[in-house]
A protein has these predicted regions:
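Short, small-residue-biased leader/transition segments that mark boundaries at the very start
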Residues: 3-4
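Short, structural beta-strand-to-alpha-helix junction motif
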Residues: 9-21, 107
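Residue-level detector of functional hotspots within protein domains
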Residues: 13, 74, 78, 91, ...
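Loop/turn positions that initiate beta-strands
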Residues: 24-25
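Alpha-helical transmembrane segments in multi-pass membrane proteins
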Residues: 30-119
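Helix-coil boundary and interhelical linker segments in multi-pass alpha-helical membrane proteins
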Residues: 56-82, 125-152
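Cytosolic-biased juxtamembrane loops and peripheral soluble domains of multi-pass membrane proteins
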Residues: 94-117, 127-186
Length: 186
């Protein structure tokens, strides 16, 4: 009989014969285990920084004071906190109301790997670095990091970037009719 290479068959809703598989004696299947929806994956990923940043922002002055480094949060630190929270809240809302997923699920065991970037890098590393005495009120006094006009300029750039990103997500959403897996090029 015919010999087929071991390759994934693309097209979940298609019959094997529609994919060119005929007269096959053996079909190999792989159990990917429990599945989790992509929407849930994104919600869990983006929830990390939304939980971690407030904990660090509120807890850092208390923690550093215990080690003899009391400080108060500066305007730049508070601004970063607000922008990070707004960014990830936007991502959560987009996951619920904007994103349309081509695949319904992914293996549940991948959620830890997928969340590592957001929870560790965007959560702990960013939060731990920004909300420390090195950017506190006393440390930035008299520097450009204490210049409100300078900071507001970058807040405006951030806002324009977020709006551009939102526009891109809306464009992509409109390219995929609801309830389909259609992929189109903008």
């Amino acid at each position: 009989g015919d010999v087929y290479k071991r390759q994934p068959l693309l097209g979940d809703e298609k019959r094997l014969s529609d994919l060119g598989v005929e007269n096959v004696a053996t079909l190999t299947l792989k159990d990917l285990g429990p599945q989790i929806s992509w929407r849930t994956v994104f919600l869990v990923e983006y929830a990390g920084p939304l939980v971690i940043h407030p904990l660090i922002y509120l807890g850092a002055p208390l923690l550093w004071a215990r080690f003899g480094y009391p400080f108060s949060m500066s305007f730049v630190q508070t601004t970063v906190f607000v922008l990070v929270m707004a960014h990830f809240l936007k991502r959560e809302l987009e996951s619920v109301f904007v994103h349309r997923f081509s695949n319904a699920t992914m293996p549940a065991f991948n959620i830890v790997k997928n969340s590592t970037h957001y929870w560790l890098l965007s959560g702990l590393v960013l939060g731990g670095g920004v909300y420390s005495p090195s950017l506190g009120v006393e440390a930035v006094r008299g520097t450009v990091r204490d210049n409100h006009a300078f900071i507001w300029f970058f807040v405006l750039l951030w806002l324009l970037s977020e709006l551009g990103n939102f526009h891109a997500h809306i464009t992509l959403m409109n390219l995929r009719p609801k309830g389909t897996r259609v992929r189109q090029i903008p």
